[in-house]
């Protein structure tokens, strides 16, 4: 692994310390976030992407909520 001194030395080599301070690392994280988003959209694992799974799960949750709401409504009608 890396020692603390090696990490510190690598971080000191990033330009813009006086002008931007700690914010000089933002472009790296911006690019990293964009790459991660691209992977989640484009890369398929099996037949699905991350967003396919997300949409399916959201749809399933919405369906379950509707079932619960209708069963509660029917229960209230039976009680009255």
Curated annotation (Swiss-Prot):
GO terms for cellular component: mitochondrial inner membrane; mitochondrion. The keyword Mitochondrion applies. One of its GO terms (biological process) is mitochondrial cytochrome c oxidase assembly. InterPro entries: UQCC5. Keywords: Membrane, Mitochondrion, Mitochondrion inner membrane, Transmembrane, Transmembrane helix. Residues 42-80 are mitochondrial intermembrane. Required for the assembly and stability of the mitochondrial ubiquinol-cytochrome c reductase complex (complex III (CIII) or cytochrome b-c1 complex), a multisubunit transmembrane complex that is part of the mitochondrial electron transport chain (ETC) which drives oxidative phosphorylation. Mediates early complex III biogenesis. Participates in regulating the levels of electron transport chain proteins, and therefore energy supply, in response to changes in energy demand. Also required for cytochrome c oxidase complex (complex IV) assembly. This is Ubiquinol-cytochrome c reductase complex assembly factor 5. It comes from Mus musculus (Mouse). The gene is Uqcc5.
